[in-house]
Curated annotation (Swiss-Prot):
The gene is lpxK. It comes from Paracoccus denitrificans (strain Pd 1222). It catalyses: a lipid A disaccharide + ATP = a lipid IVA + ADP + H(+). The lineage of its organism: Bacteria, Pseudomonadati, Pseudomonadota, Alphaproteobacteria, Rhodobacterales. The keyword Nucleotide-binding applies. Keywords: ATP-binding, Kinase, Lipid A biosynthesis, Lipid biosynthesis, Lipid metabolism, Nucleotide-binding, Transferase. It holds the Pfam family LpxK. Transfers the gamma-phosphate of ATP to the 4'-position of a tetraacyldisaccharide 1-phosphate intermediate (termed DS-1-P) to form tetraacyldisaccharide 1,4'-bis-phosphate (lipid IVA). SUPFAM superfamilies: P-loop containing nucleoside triphosphate hydrolases. GO terms for biological process: lipid A biosynthetic process; lipopolysaccharide core region biosynthetic process. Belongs to the LpxK family. Its EC number is 2.7.1.130. This is Tetraacyldisaccharide 4'-kinase. One of its GO terms (cellular component) is plasma membrane.
Amino acid sequence: MSRRAPDFWFQPPGLRARLLAPLGALYAAATARRLARGPRTRPGVPVICIGNLNAGGTGKTPTTIMLARLLQDRGVAVHIVSRGYGGSEKGPRRVEEARHSAAEVGDEPLLMAAFAPVWVADDRLAGARAAVEAGAQAILLDDGFQDPALAHDLSLVVVDAAKGFGNGLCLPAGPLREPVDRGLARAGLLLSIGEAAAQARFAATLGTRLPLPHLTGRLAPLQTGMDWQGQRVLAFAGIGHPEKFFATLRGLGADVVRAEALEDHQPFTPQLLIRLETESRLTGAQMVTTEKDAVRLPRSFRPKVLALPVRLQLDDAAPLEERLASLGL
């Protein structure tokens, strides 16, 4: 099933959006009722939720990795809890890189397991309790902003600055899981990710009366010593916004011979891999993908593909550091 967001979500509301708006209102009402029920249980250690208001990719995974490394640098034993979207494991189960596959635990948890202990669990509360029993001093909740089962000591809402909050309507009329004003009223920090021009446009749509501190940041390629200048590449990506990955490669000087935009979490079937490898050989282009896609590749195929890692860089981390300090972290 396709998970790529339809274009009309990010355009001024037209006929299609207006026709679907009543369903969006019902979706928003259902979310509000679910959030009101609670029970908002506390697992005994600080819980930091990295969530979003939009459906789809907004940069939660690199944000979670950044927070994990920040807390580790402070000597905090931090664990990550995730639903493990796309994986078959119901959990709670600790992710083991050498043992588990993306089909079992999901691609994001498998990627994040290289940075911190990760637990996948359909029941986030059960996952948090398992993490605490294993020694977690703080929990990063990957997604779950609209899940009332677990109390959040700090909620960080992540948004793609280039996409913003789309047409401002809830699913299926727009990209939102809940109305922007309600969501931001429950959050502790807003983080927009993107380049300077996109950040300026997004800030203009927000106005000056935000109810919470606004962080900005961007995803920057990790310096690995690889010289991309003039390198012929066949790039493929199955992430929320694959065009950003292709633009990053071009910005590094790579000659992108072909850019294959896959659906988010699209399976790598044998037929797809054979086609990519054949095109790579015929064009003399090196296959390149994202870190998240690389962990989904069959182990036997991975040596044929380069991965381009990116890391989140905050413009000013002070508001985040203040919130962490208030939690004793």
